[in-house]
Amino acid sequence: MKLGRYSLFLLCPLLASCSGNGFYKDNLGVIDKNILHADTSLLKSKNKEHYKSSDMVSKTDSIYIGNSSFQTYHGEPLPGKLEGVHGIILRSSTPLGFDEVLSMIQDSSGIPIVKHTTKDVISGGVSSKSLAATVAEKMNSATGGKSTDQFDHLLLEVSSEHQLMDVNYQGALSTFLDKVAANYNLYWTYESGRIAFSNEETKRFSISILPGGKYTSKNSISSDSNSSSGSSGSSGSSSSDSGAELKFDSDVDFWKDIENSIKLILGSDGSYSISTSTSSVIVRTSSANMKKINEYINTLNAQLERQVTIDVAIYNVTTTDSSDLAMSLEALLKHNGGVLGSVSTSNFAATSGTPSFTGYLNGNGDSSNQVLLNLLAEKGKVSVVTSASVTTMSGQPVPLKVGNDRTYVSEIGTVLSQSSTSTTASTSTVTSGFLMNLLPQVADDGNILLQYGVTLSELVGSNNGFDQATVNGTVIQLPNVDSTTFVQSSMLRNGNTLVLAGYEKKRNESVDQGVGTTSFKLLGGALNGSASRTVTVICITPRIIDLKASGE
C-alpha cells in the first residue's frame, strides 16, 4: 500500500510535466506561426514581385497578353457591315468640299449626317470669299494699292485650299470619318442612328492626385511632449526642447500648374472646368486641341502614378582602422558602381555634419547588400542597426523613424502657500536613433532623383545617456545628445544602392589599478588601454514599382 502511494506521488510531477509540455508545444507553434507571418509580411513590404526591370530588353518565359485598354469617344459602334475591309468605297476624280464629302458618305452608307457647328469656315465658299476679301483689303491698304478681282480670287484659292479633300478610299467607315475630322479639325459621333460632326468636343479627364483645393506636402518627424506631475494638489507642465526633428516642407499647388498648362494649350479656343473635389477636368475645345489636352493629361498621369519602394539599411562596423575601411569601400564602389563626390581616405570624421563618403552599387537583384556586407565583415564586426522598406508615389516625400523616445525630469519646482508646500516636476522627451525623410522623383528615362534628409542622434551621457546636475540638493537630468543632420540629393539608376559612410564614433579606454594608489602595483594592479572606432554605413536602394506589368 505504501509503495502504491509512493508511486502515485512520483507520477504526479510526471503528469504535470506532460501537461506543461503540451502547453509549451502549443505556445511554441503559435510563436513560430507569428514569426513566419512577420517574415512574410516583411518580404511583401519590399514589393519584390513588382520591381520594374531597368534592362534595355526584358524577357519572360510566360505567356504575354497585353493589358492595355482604350476607350472610344465616338458614341455607339458603327454598323458592323461598314467596319470591314470593304466596309465603304468612296472615290472622286477631283477634290471635294466638306459638304460634298458628307453627301458622298451619306449616299454610300445610308446613314444620315448632321452638322453642329458655329464656324462658317466649313459651311461653304461665302465665308471663305469674305475672308479672302478682308485679307486682300488689309494687304492692299498696307501696301498702298487697290484691291482687284484677280487678287481676291487668288486669296480665295489659297484660303479655301484646305477646305478641299481628295477622296479615294476603301475600308472601315470609322477610319474615313477620322480622316475627314482631322482634315477639317472636327469631331464626329454616332448616336441614335446618325452621324454628327461638330467643331467642338467635350471630354472629362481624371487626374491621378488626391482631391483637394491645394496639394501641400509637409512631412516631418519630431519628438515633442507635454506632461505634468505634482503633489499636494499642485500641477505642472513641460514641453520638449531637446527632441530630434527632421522636416521637409513642399508647398506645391498641382491644380494651379494643371490650370496654367491647360490655358496655354487651349489659348482662346475652348473652355474648361476643374473639379478639385473629384480630381477631374472637363474640357470643351476643337478636335485638334483636344488631342493635345489628351496627350498632356495622359503624360501627366503616367508621371503621377509612378511608385517607388525604398529599402533602407543601417550597419555599424566596429574596427580599429577606419582609413583601411575607407580605401576598401572606395575600391569596391569603383569596381561595382561609382563614387559620388570627394572621398576622404584618411579617416571618417563627420565634423561637418555630412557623410565624408558617398557612392553607389549597381543593382544586381540582391536586396540584402551581401557584396557590401562581405567587405564590411572583413574589416570589423558588423551589426545591423535597422532595416526598413517604405513605398511612396513619385514626387511625394515619405518619412521614416527608427528611434527611442526617452522621458526625463527636466525641472523641479517648489510652490509655497499659506498652509502647505508642494513640489512640481516637469518632464521633457528626447529622441535618439535614426530619422530620415525621402523624396524620390522618377524621370522619363527610368532614373531616380532622390533627395534624402538624415538625422542620426545618440545619447552619450555618463549616466545612461544623461548627465546630472545638482541644484540646491535637487538632482536634474540633462540629456547629452550627439547628432548629425544633413540633406542631400543624388541621381541613381533603378535598383542602385546609395552608400553613405563617414559617421565615426571613437572610444578610448584606459585602466590603471594599484593597491592604495594607482602608482603602487607591487602587490597587484593593472595598466592597460584599448581604442576602437564604430563607423555607421547607410544603404538606400530605390526601386520603381510596375503594378500594371504585374497585372494589378
UniProtKB/Swiss-Prot annotation:
Residues 218-243 have a biased composition (Low complexity). GO terms for cellular component: cell outer membrane. Residues 218-244 are annotated as: Disordered. Residues 1-17 form the signal peptide. It comes from Escherichia coli O111:H-. The keyword Glycoprotein does not apply. It is found in: Cell outer membrane. Induction: During exponential-phase growth; repressed by ammonium. The lineage of its organism: Bacteria, Pseudomonadati, Pseudomonadota, Gammaproteobacteria, Enterobacterales. A lipid is attached at residue 18 (N-palmitoyl cysteine). One of its GO terms (biological process) is pilus assembly. This is Outer membrane lipoprotein BfpB. Keywords: Cell outer membrane, Fimbrium biogenesis, Lipoprotein, Membrane, Palmitate, Plasmid, Signal. It is a lipid-anchor. Pfam families: Secretin (PF00263), Secretin_N_2 (PF07655). A lipid is attached at residue 18 (S-diacylglycerol cysteine). Belongs to the bacterial secretin family.
